[in-house]
Every structure is written in C-alpha cells, then in structure tokens.
Amino acid sequence: MNKLILLTTLLFLSACAAMQSDDPDSLFFSIPKGSTLSLNKKLDIPHNETHAVIQYGKETTDNKRHDYDVNCRLNLKEFGPRTIEPENFKVTRTEDGQNWISQPSILRYYTEIYLTSDKGTDVIKMVCQEYGDQTDYHFTVEDIEVALGDYFSFTFPEKIDSGK
C-alpha cells in the first residue's frame, strides 16, 4: 500500500513538472525573472491615482474597463497627474493566481508582474486580470500582450529560467 501511495505521489509530481513551457502563447508559460517590460510610449497617470489602466491597447479608467476581458494596470507609488516616459523595466518575479469575486460564480484570474526601474521611476508592479467562472482558465502572456497593444512589450531572456 505504501508503494502505491509513493508511486501515485511521484506520478502526480512529475505531471506537474511537465506543465512548464518556453512558449509565451502557452497556458503553462510563466514570465521569467530577468525579462524586460518596455513602456514604448508616454503613459498618463490620472489625477489622484497611483496607476494607469490599459485595455484593448488603449488607456482607460477603472470605471470604464471591461472586467471580463484582460486588462492591465501599472501600479506606482506616487499620485498623479503626471506622465511616465518610455523606459525599460526589469521583471523581478511574477505571480499567477485566482480569487473569488462573487462565490460561487465569478472568479478573478490575475498575473502580478513585479518590476524595477533603472531610471528611478517609482514603479511597483503591473497587474493583469480578467473575470471568469470556474470553467474558464487563466489567460496567456499573448493575451496580456494583446491587452497592452503598443504601449508595452516584453523581451524574454534567451535561456528561460524555471524559477519565477
């Protein structure tokens, strides 16, 4: 009986390990540490806000975003109004997850991309999210890129590190 439990556990763990991918279009791809997130054009931070929201490749607001499609917000420490100039941010880690918005019907799927700036910009992270239900799945990096349009782009390291 113990051998059966051990074998089952090993099979389960090996199946999970195989769910890694180097393909950004895959559900199993995680943005690797050391990647670059480039802001390609000026981004406005609204008055009394510490973030900007991007969806469908355009700047929007929290009230105007469509929660059931992928949307991303760049979180900063200081309040606007102000403009963030184009620059490259380094990815220090990422976290994928989900939490209930209205149990048992609405889930929030999210990816948090923690960032640093060599220019001293007070960036904290980019959070991309989408609402769905239990039958939905987490969005891909390609979905994030579509939501960001030409505002942001990713550059991934040549050798993908399996750590986040």
Enumerate the language-model features and the residues they cover.
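Extracytoplasmic
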Residues: 32-34, 84-88, 108-110, 123
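C-terminal partner/receptor-binding element of secreted or periplasmic proteins
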Residues: 121-164
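N-terminal secretory signal peptides
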Residues: 18-85, 93
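Short, linear, compositionally biased motifs with a strong N-terminal bias
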Residues: 10-11
